[in-house]
Regions:
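Intracellular loop-helix junctions on the cytosolic face of multi-pass helical membrane proteins
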Residues: 1-7, 131-135, 139, 161-294
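C-terminal ends and interior cores of transmembrane alpha-helices
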Residues: 78-100
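Short amphipathic helix-loop junctions that connect adjacent transmembrane helices
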Residues: 26-44, 165
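Central cavity-lining transmembrane alpha-helices of secondary-active solute carriers
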Residues: 50-68, 154-156
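Cytosolic juxtamembrane N-terminal segment immediately preceding the first transmembrane helix
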Residues: 1-16, 20
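Cytoplasmic membrane-interface "Motif A"-like loop-to-helix N-cap segments
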Residues: 68-81, 136
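Hydrophobic core of transmembrane alpha-helices in multi-pass small-molecule transporters
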Residues: 17, 86, 98-120, 288
């Protein structure tokens, strides 16, 4: 499986592993961050999260158009930089008012950066196998590539949880899912007597000395800061991804070409007939239908 693969495959796979690790680290704590920091309800959080994911999966369409014009490598590099800025905005502790502006700005940047990165890196992987000596290894190459992606996605939630719990523990607190919502209800003056009694018992379990209002404010602030550190992990992951991409660029530079650029001399271009093109489009539409509805 691994024998005879071009070196560029491993460079691109590792770069993508770093990017996916950062992305899924962010996803693992993002909805919790929204509820803890801003007091959003589950419905409001779901709406924001859904719109963000819709943008993440739609913007690659435009990323592909830009790559056809400017080149895949440039778009991948720009995508990493834009995503890094987005994660950095999430990692900066802020007040509620400026925090919301920065949060929505960060989501826009992450979605745009992912749109430039996602897909274009895969195209370069495919281009590595246009050369006749590697064409038979294309299927196993993408198995390796997506294996690397899944490794990054598998460890990301654990990393996010560990960092968050560690930083919260340094403040002498532990994570309890009910506290952020109850704390916001208390501070907003909307808490019921039963919920306030629950909150007071949770405060006692945290061994917090102080009035309940101070506990609510402190817990929200410290938990939000802990999530900021979690987003910082995503920033570090992207830096590693960029370093791998730049350091080993020579191993896949020859695969950074599109239809408007000169192809390497050893690349054999496959010409599709109109009937073959039609069949592939129909197959894609059927796949879309299955993915969307099932």
């Amino acid at each position: 499986m691994f024998e005879g693969q071009p070196k560029g495959l491993y460079a691109l796979a590792l770069a993508n592993t770093g990017e996916r690790f950062g992305y899924y680290t962010m996803l693992a704590i993002f909805t919790l961050f929204l509820q803890a920091k801003f007091g959003y309800t589950a419905a409001e959080t779901s709406t924001i999260f859904g719109c963000f994911l819709a943008a993440v999966y739609f913007i690659p369409f435009f990323g592909g158009i830009l790559a056809d014009k400017f080149g895949y490598g440039k778009m991948v590099t720009m995508g990493i930089v834009v995503m890094f800025i987005g994660y950095a905005l999430l990692a900066i502790p802020t007040s509620d008012n400026s925090g919301k502006i920065m949060m929505f700005g960060a989501l826009a940047l992450i979605a745009c950066g992912t749109g430039l990165f996602k897909g274009n890196l895969q195209v370069m992987v495919g281009n590595l196998y246009d050369a006749p000596e590697y064409s038979s290894k294309r299927d196993t190459a993408f198995s390796i590539f997506y294996m690397a992606i899944n490794i990054g996605a598998m460890y990301a939630p654990t990393a996010a949880t560990k960092v968050t719990n560690y930083m919260l523990g340094k403040a002498g607190l532990s994570y309890v899912p009910q506290i952020p919502s109850l704390a916001h209800q208390y501070l907003d003056g909307t808490i019921t007597p039963a919920n306030q009694a629950t909150l007071e018992s949770l405060q006692a379990a945290q061994n917090f000395t102080g009035d309940i209002a101070t506990f609510c404010t402190t817990y929200i602030d410290k938990l939000s800061e802990a999530y900021n550190y979690g987003f910082g992990v995503a920033c570090v992951s992207l830096i590693i991804s960029m370093l791998i991409y730049v350091a080993f660029r020579s191993t896949f530079k020859h695969a950074d070409y599109n239809s408007k650029q000169a192809k390497p001399a050893n690349v054999v271009e496959e010409k599709l007939t109109p009937e073959q093109t039609k069949q592939r489009i129909v197959a894609l539409l059927l796949v879309f239908a299955v993915v969307i509805f099932f």
